[in-house]
């Protein structure tokens, strides 16, 4: 039998191995797990082979915090609160909070550069590329808006290009584009408003105290540039935004023993002591807000244009400032300079630190004018007529205010009429400051009992007085300032009501007088309490004493009988102590040179850490060493200790 022949058709060739198609795999079902019996436990099925499914993770959005929030967190940490609780309240990790604490100087600097309430709302510290042009345009804008002049975008852009040519020269390629103008608006928080109608022409002369709202003008774009502060005509000041300043006279190194003229008893004229110690009298300006939480540095005004003890020293480190006046009085230029150089920057820093609106008002009582004998330039007057107090002595409120009107001065009414409003600080705060100052002065005198009162007066310099004035002002409690504000403002509403804290103030005054009497008894054995009380209230007139403008002879040193009994008792013991065998005793010149070297080193340190006590004691030792060694006073000491 023959095999069957193949069917007709093309011959089938075997497919190469590399061209063969893969054999399809059969998808086998996963084995079923047996049903659990009554005594067995169910196990979860094993995970299926292959990649695991991805789980969607919800991303947290990054939150940008404003400078105001950062400063609030910083103040809470500096106030003693734990960092963990602050982080929990703000919802930030600990590293972010520590970064804010590290960048605090940068945040403060940025607010100083930008200023205003808008700066605290910024989330990025980014200034303009052309800072000079930006500041010039903003200052020009505030000046015109204060006078009610409407401004449009093209006008501001043209003025910016004009400022650029003035600052960088005519070859400047700066272009005030629409983008620059938009960023400038956002940077300073200036909004655009469209107004209609017709505006009145601006009033010639200085800007009025109460700015009237602008009348509608022709259709145009009005830029309202008061987002940071409300107009001062709207009021709305908080307790921490209301300040008061008052001046007082002070004999800064007069001791109780020098108050009375030796050997004259009660025949001394009333103004004799004032004329004798006129060169030691200064005027002190004190300022604080209503709550007492912000007390500015005291301003001391003296008759020395360049005190030797203040040379080569940075006065910014002292707790009090010093200014020169020929009659030691707060003149108009001094008040204006203090307002713009110290008061306005200090108040704005405090308001930014407290996250408050950038506006404040300063209430100033017209201080009593100097005596007619004082050499001050004035109008023609008769010889027998004393000078009357004139309001223009210190300037007008229009001049004492910032360009935007946010910080300004208001003068309280004077006179014996019912409209008279006494200054709040006159109700015990100024007296408390002077009592504290004289108490610290007596403590220094008692600590330097090894020398005479004249040695102490030569050792106690004006630099020590500035430190002592700042220390005494810091000792005045905030509650006392707030209570005196209530007593002072009550006269405007309840003229006949008696103070509620009169008994408490009398008790405090009695305790202070007792302390001063005790300290005076330690230094002066023959001093009566009445003489201490007279010395305590010697400069309570508030102004310059009569006769200070006259030329007076320098006061003679006190007689030996009036000196404390403990003074000069140890000179013989010191002479006996020098006769020591085998010990090389230094000469008086070497001792003075070593003490002066130590004094120069001590004066170069921070005055807040050193304090006036160590300096006065060391100067007293130098004076005593010169007197014992028969050495004349040095060139630095020839300026009568100032």
Curated annotation (Swiss-Prot):
It comes from the Eukaryota. Residues 31-52 have a biased composition (Pro residues). The keyword Nucleus applies. Keywords: DNA-binding, Nucleus. InterPro entries: CenT-Element_Derived, DDE_SF_endonuclease_dom, Homeodomain-like_sf, HTH_CenpB_DNA-bd_dom, HTH_Psq, WH-like_DNA-bd_sf. Residues 1-54, 198-230, 543-583 are annotated as: Disordered. Pfam families: CENP-B_N, DDE_1, HTH_Tnp_Tc5. Residues 56-107 form the HTH psq-type domain. Residues 83-103, 154-187 bind DNA. This is Tigger transposable element derived 5. The lineage of its organism: Eukaryota, Metazoa, Chordata, Craniata, Vertebrata. The gene is Tigd5.
